[in-house]
Amino acid sequence: MKVVILKRDKVGDMLLATPMLEHLRRALPQAEIHMLANDYNAWVLEGNRNIDRLWVYPRVRHGASLRPWAVIEQLRQLWRLRRERFDFAIAAGGVVSPRAVERILRLGAARTVAYAGHNKDNRAADAALFARLTDALPYDGTLHEVESNLRLLTPLGVAMPVAPSYPGFALPAPWINEARTWLDSQGIAPGKFIVIGLNARRLKRKPSTDQILRWSQHFKRRLGLDSVLIWQPGAADDRVYPGDDAIVAPFISTLPAHLKPFRNPADVRAAMGVVWHAATSLFPDGGIAHLASVSPGGVLALFAETDVSPHPDNWRPYAPKGTYLEAPKAVTELSDEAVFAKVDWLLDKSTVSTRTSGVDST
């Protein structure tokens, strides 16, 4: 059996597709598994042993820029993909996505699997598009993204796993080693600090500077742990990913000695190297929070206004050492006591873990 799985979305979405790959490999060890990803999220699967081939297509739109050459490259790749004569093409993801359905239908697979049906963004023409699927599954908005992905394997004769299947990510050793060098330069020992992150697309999900200062002070006085502040570099109006420089600039020069700023370069894997050495981490809901959830220290993810934003039921960290807090409107509403209780829970978990998700953890 030859299977291709499409994942169009961002980094966190790709990480949450890894349990699907692991479960498929275990259930059908002889299957040939291909993954089709874009040039924004494909790196999450580098080194993943559960796929036989990773196809990467360039996005036509990158932030505010259009890349006409990407159209030509996608057409060339489509011709090569159709020659593979896949038995199944699956549009991974826990939502109804007409764009994903349209893309897998172009692949010429014998059977096509995706969620179909009601979606507030669907156009009237989408019903005809969904009708072309050989295996259109009804959308269940109560499931977590991981569970929704696993459910897409049922047309292949693969039942849902009995035990939880967790995401896995192989952070390359050079990033871990580079982070260790930076920590040494700051006089911070591995496992003796907590990461506080600002990275989020929406301001309502970010902790305030006052919260960051209070939390780091508590971690130092009560736990004897330093803190490392990580933020997204760049301007707030960046079309690829909004930056946090304007938030950090007013107080970066007056940080206390126990709060170290990590001037994260463009590649998020540099920040992940630091996270891999942390006792635990706090991040706003988003892709980096999911990556941090599979690090040795785990993560506390901060959610806000989930009546209009992704809900923890669908999007919480799906890992043994992942937990979350949910604020009515903004993360600034969260009490310090609630944050400290969650951090204590994470620190009570074992500080060293060996992941068994089918990919290397180092």
Predicted segment positions?
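Catalytic machinery of carbohydrate-active enzymes
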Residues: 1-362
